UniProtKB/Swiss-Prot annotation:
Protein's gene: ycf3
Keywords: Membrane, Photosynthesis, Repeat, Thylakoid, TPR repeat
TPR repeat copies, ranges: 35-68, 72-105, 120-153
A GO biological process held by the record: photosynthesis
Gene3D superfamilies, per database record: Tetratricopeptide repeat domain
Name used for this protein in its record: Photosystem I assembly protein Ycf3
Pfam families: TPR_7, TPR_8
Organism annotation: Prochlorococcus marinus (strain MIT 9301)
Length: 173
């Protein structure tokens, strides 16, 4: 196990050195370079489990980043942290912001649906079947969009949609 970990650390370090070299020599504005560095540092902190530090780096990156796709990716990473921290409403709000920046992120839709589906299961456990159906319908709505964007990529969700009777035939056309 340690040899695999050493190899992984070597690969991570090599990638970081290469990425930093590319950023230094690329003819891009200083502002964009700083945005990337904040994003990269946020990703490293997130991977190390330091979520509060990661969020700070991501927020700094967003202040500088102008590219919508990159902004969407940063917001998606922030939403993942909020979701991990149990801040579901903030997570949904942040995923929705990510989708405004880059509407072609099926993983954002998938994760919003996961929150809705969880809320539906909780309502069902509490005996509130009307509320369960509301949450499950919301999950189905966003999951259907995710499946359309990434056909075959979320087979478990496709199965849930079919088994729950919430699948629409046009989803597969």
């Amino acid at each position: 196990m340690p040899s695999n970990q050493n190899r992984d650390n070597f690969i991570d370090k090599a990638f970081t050195v290469i990425a930093e070299s590319i950023v230094k020599i690329m003819p891009i504005a200083e502002k964009e370079k700083k945005a990337y560095i904040y994003y990269r540092d946020g990703l490293a902190a997130q991977n190390n489990g330091d979520y509060s530090e990661a969020l700070e780096y991501y927020k700094e990156s967003l202040l500088l980043e102008e590219n919508k796709i990159d902004r969407g990716e940063t917001l998606k990473n922030m939403a993942i942290i909020y979701m991990s921290n149990g801040e579901e409403d903030l997570s949904i709000e942040t995923y929705e912001k990510a989708l405004v920046e880059n509407p072609k992120q099926p993983s954002c839709l998938k994760n919003i649906g996961l929150i809705y589906e969880k809320r539906g299961r909780n309502a069902e456990q509490n005996g509130d079947l009307d509320q369960r159906d509301i949450w499950f319908d919301k999950a189905a709505e966003v999951w259907s969009k995710a499946v359309r964007l990434y056909p075959g990529g979320y087979l478990d969700i496709e199965n849930w949609l079919k088994n729950s009777g919430r699948s629409s035939i046009d989803m597969y056309l």
